[in-house]
């Protein structure tokens, strides 16, 4: 009986977490217009998930690649 109670509790917690991520996803790619990039990033960081803004993802990758090239010694 204790096992089933724990299992049910875990299911409830996971449902709440994933509902939060879904709400976050909808707010980033909603029909009411795309929010600012910073809002989207903050939203997905708090949900523990990568944000859905493709343009921002590319921008971050580009910046990361530039920083990596700066750190590499040129021989």
Curated annotation (Swiss-Prot):
Provide the free-text tissue specificity comment from this protein's UniProt record. Answer: Expressed by the venom duct.
Which is a Gene Ontology cellular component entry for this protein? Answer: extracellular region
Q: Which UniProt keywords apply?
A: Cleavage on pair of basic residues, Disulfide bond, Neurotoxin, Secreted, Signal, Toxin
Extract the GO molecular function terms from the UniProt entry: toxin activity
Maturation propeptide residues:
24-50
> Signal peptide: which range, if any?
1-23
Localization terms from the record: Secreted
S-S pairs: 24-28, 37-40, 41-43
The main place the protein resides is secreted
| UniProt entry tagged with the keyword Disulfide bond | yes
Q: Does the keyword Ubl conjugation apply?
A: no
Relay the domain remarks: The cysteine framework is XXIII (C-C-C-CC-C).
Physiological role:
Probable neurotoxin.
Protein's name according to its UniProt entry: Conotoxin Im23.5
Q: Which organism is it from?
A: Conus imperialis (Imperial cone)
